[in-house]
Regions:
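Active-site helix of classical SDR
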Residues: 122, 160, 168
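Conserved glycine-rich cofactor-binding loop
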Residues: 19-20
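Substrate-binding pocket helix/loop in short-chain dehydrogenase/reductase
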Residues: 97-99, 103-111, 137, 208
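A conserved structural motif in NAD(P)-dependent oxidoreductases
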Residues: 212-223, 234
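Short, small/polar-rich loop/turn modules that mediate ligand/substrate recognition or access, typified
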Residues: 176, 181, 238-240
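Residue(s) in the substrate-gating loop at a strand-loop-helix junction
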Residues: 142
């Protein structure tokens, strides 16, 4: 029964932002569940090594380049077949900056990377999921799209991640008749290349621990269970939701 609920039985899955951190962990988890995984990111050397480990395929893609985004799904389809699972992990922001000082180019790039590119990938994956009669899209957001975080000003990033939850709800309603589910996972703070400095600094680490009810630090492995649940049949009646995985941060 458990294998039926969480097994992905040869379904093609595309994971963006997969060269390291959460994206790589998601790719490993889906592959372990039986998916045939295509990994996409800018860092092609890391990507190739991961794809070899998983028995999948690597496709280099810069999500700030619309031409590369528009062809990513077709490049995956040529090598593995059309994706039935899409996990939009890639994202990020230029750095903490007061809203009134954010440069227009920075705002544009942040919105493109975190919202526009995932939307476009959903659009290009859509016909393949329709043809398969089913599909699961999991967008990876952040608690920054749910609440403001004092001391870490990131307005354009917060706007993009909040927009991702709105996009998720809208696509879920539009595409439900095709058997396509669309959900978002919104992680809180967890150890990664990007956040390591927060954990290495005694003061910021104490701040994280003080504001997180669960009494331990999270790793990427603490986030991927929600993604696997939403990607497979265990979550077959869940759509349009933003699942917050934050150790209780937003429940305070």
């Amino acid at each position: 029964m458990t294998d039926q609920m969480f097994g992905l039985d040869g379904r093609v899955a595309l994971v963006t932002g997969a060269s390291s951190g959460l994206g790589a962990e998601v790719a490993r988890t889906l592959a372990a569940a039986g998916a045939r995984v295509a990994v996409a990111a800018r860092r092609e050397d890391r990507l190739a090594a991961l794809a070899d480990d998983l028995g999948g395929v690597a496709v280099a893609c810069d999500l700030l380049d619309p031409a590369q985004v528009d062809t990513l799904v077709s490049r995956v389809t040529e090598r593995l077949g059309g994706p039935e699972i899409l996990v939009n992990v890639a994202g990020g922001f230029a750095g903490a900056c007061p809203a009134e000082e954010e440069a227009p180019a920075t705002v544009s790039d942040t919105l493109t990377l975190n919202l526009v590119a995932p939307f476009r990938l959903c659009q290009t994956a859509f016909p393949h999921m329709v043809a398969a009669g089913r599909g699961a899209i999991v967008n990876v957001s952040s608690i920054s799209g749910q609440v403001g975080i004092p001391g870490i000003p990131q307005a354009s990033y917060a706007a993009a991640k909040a927009g991702l939850s709105g996009l998720t709800a809208e696509l879920a309603v539009q595409w439900a008749p095709h058997g396509i589910r669309v959900n978002t996972v919104a992680p809180g703070f967890f150890r990664s290349e990007i956040t390591e400095s927060l954990y290495d600094d005694e003061r910021s680490h104490a701040w994280l621990r003080r504001n997180t009810p669960l009494p331990y630090d999270a790793e990427a492995s603490d986030i991927v269970g929600a993604v696997l649940w939403l990607a497979g049949d265990a979550g077959r009646y869940v759509t349009g939701q933003t699942i917050v995985v934050d150790g209780g941060w937003t429940a305070r």
